[in-house]
């Protein structure tokens, strides 16, 4: 085990939108080290968002992430031979990571033709409080609410 926590590395802002969130999204989309492909997908999707909404695409991304970010999650805790699902608060950084992960996961499951269209539509759905990634957040919250009785096992 480590002696101390690994230091957090700074996130570089992306060159087009000057946003750390966009950089994180590019890195989540990334497969097989093909960063230029990932950037093309993200920038293309943000451009579609700009055309459809007529507003700043980074604002749309932030709104979408705000609707997907979980406040609570359940973590397994073993107590005397039984495993309980204990609801815990989610740290802001982890909430962001989970939101991005869910967005990308459900983007890949969509049925549109190109990845650019899928990402754009998932972002727009999430910004409007719709879509599979928002449902995932609600399911996570429901699970935490259902297991509130075990909240005293929190650590």
Swiss-Prot record:
Keywords: Ribonucleoprotein, Ribosomal protein, RNA-binding, rRNA-binding, tRNA-binding
One Gene Ontology cellular component annotation held by this UniProt entry: small ribosomal subunit
Gene Ontology terms: biological process: translation
A Gene Ontology molecular function term of the record: rRNA binding
Coiled-coil positions: none
Pfam families membership: Ribosomal_S7
Family matches, as Gene3D superfamilies: Ribosomal protein S7 domain (1.10.455.10)
SUPFAM superfamilies cross-referenced by the UniProt entry: Ribosomal protein S7
Keyword Membrane applies: no
CDD domains in the cross-refs: uS7_Bacteria (cd14869)
InterPro entries membership: Ribosomal_uS7 (IPR000235), Ribosomal_uS7_bac/org-type (IPR005717), Ribosomal_uS7_CS (IPR020606), Ribosomal_uS7_dom (IPR023798), Ribosomal_uS7_dom_sf (IPR036823)
Subunit structure and binding partners: Part of the 30S ribosomal subunit. Contacts proteins S9 and S11.
NCBIfam families the UniProt entry points to: rpsG_bact
Function description: One of the primary rRNA binding proteins, it binds directly to 16S rRNA where it nucleates assembly of the head domain of the 30S subunit. Is located at the subunit interface close to the decoding center, probably blocks exit of the E-site tRNA.
Family membership: Belongs to the universal ribosomal protein uS7 family.
Protein name: Small ribosomal subunit protein uS7
């Amino acid at each position: 085990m480590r002696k101390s926590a690994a230091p957090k590395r700074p996130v570089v802002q992306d060159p087009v939108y000057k946003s750390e969130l966009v950089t994180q999204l590019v890195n989540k989309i990334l497969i097989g080290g093909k960063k230029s492909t990932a950037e093309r997908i993200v920038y293309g999707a943000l451009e579609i968002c700009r055309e459809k909404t007529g507003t700043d695409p980074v604002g749309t991304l932030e709104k979408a992430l705000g609707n997907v970010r979980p406040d609570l999650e359940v973590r397994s805790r073993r107590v005397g031979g039984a495993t309980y699902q204990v609801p815990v608060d989610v740290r802001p950084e982890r909430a962001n990571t989970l939101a991005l992960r869910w967005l990308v996961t459900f983007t890949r499951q969509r049925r549109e033709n190109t990845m650019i269209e899928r990402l754009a539509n998932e972002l727009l759905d999430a910004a409007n409080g719709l879509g599979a990634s928002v449902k995932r957040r609600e399911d996570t919250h429901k699970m935490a609410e259902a297991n509130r009785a075990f909240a005293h096992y929190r650590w």
